[in-house]
Design a protein with these regions (language model features):
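N-terminal targeting signals for export/organelle localization
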Residues: 1-57, 205-208
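Short loop/turn microsegments at loop-to-beta-strand junctions
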Residues: 51-52, 74, 172-174
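Short active-site neighborhood of thiol/selenol oxidoreductases, capturing the structured segment around
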Residues: 66-94
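Solvent-exposed coil/turn segments that connect beta secondary-structure elements
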Residues: 69-71, 80-81, 114-119, 135, ...
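Sec/Tat-exported extracytoplasmic proteins
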Residues: 73, 98-105, 133, 154-157, ...
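Structural microenvironment flanking redox-active thiols in thiol-disulfide oxidoreductases
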Residues: 91-153
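Structural micro-motif
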Residues: 139-140, 151, 157-163, 170-175
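Thiol-/selenol-based redox modules, centered on thioredoxin-like
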Residues: 164-208
Length: 208
């Protein structure tokens, strides 16, 4: 982890995981405001997730840092490809958000899925998932990471997860909107939620 703050976050996540999964509720949670002052390329605020130095692999086999997603808003969720119920609904919710944007705005928003399953969700497995779900390459990014990096990112996103003995994951369902600098500006918690406010947030971010 890169800072004492991250270490504290991860400790809290570990202690509270089981209770938090049991108590999760399906409500929307929004963080204030969205539009930050533009920064020079490669520089991020202290609230930006793009400060994380970990390296990820896309389903196309490209190695990237999260900062390479900067420049336009991102709709981000964590999942695993073998998930039979929750994750497909989460992806569908993201597709609902995508479809609700006007075509000219849709092209200015990215959609990112990050796998919990470092062991099984190889780039090839993620590429197959993309084909199965018909996720356009020009807008959607699918990421595989090492287990420690996944844990760090999950903590920063407020996503709680735990692998069971069968290789399945119990996890919270959170769709996060990041602004162009990688700051969290909205989180939609739970499945099948009303997407209106999330769409409005994205419209503001891209300057409708």
């Amino acid at each position: 982890m890169n800072t004492p703050k991250l270490i504290i976050i991860l400790a809290v996540l570990s202690i509270g995981l089981s209770a938090s999964l049991a108590a999760e509720t399906n409500t929307d949670s929004a963080t204030p405001s969205c539009c930050s002052t533009s920064l020079p390329a490669g520089e991020f605020t202290d609230k930006s997730l793009y400060q994380v130095e970990s390296t990820w692999t896309t389903d196309q086999g490209k190695h990237i840092k999260l900062g390479e997603l900067a420049g336009k808003p991102q709709v981000v969720a964590m999942f695993f490809a073998n998930c039979q119920y929750v994750c497909p609904v989460t992806v569908h919710d993201m597709q609902r958000i995508e479809a609700a944007l006007a075509p000219e705005l849709r092209a200015r928003v990215g959609f990112t899925l990050v796998s919990f399953d470092s062991k099984n969700d190889s780039p090839a497995a993620l590429a197959e998932f993309r084909l199965t779900r018909a996720l356009p390459k020009e807008r959607w990014t699918l990421l595989h990471g090492e287990s420690d990096d996944v844990l760090e990112l999950a903590a920063l996103l407020g996503v709680k997860y735990k692998e069971d003995a069968n290789g399945q994951f119990a996890h919270s369902t959170v769709i996060t909107v990041l602004n162009a600098q990688g700051e969290i500006v909205r989180q939609q918690i739970g499945l099948g939620q009303d997407i209106k406010e999330t769409v409005q947030t994205l419209e503001k971010l891209v300057g409708k």
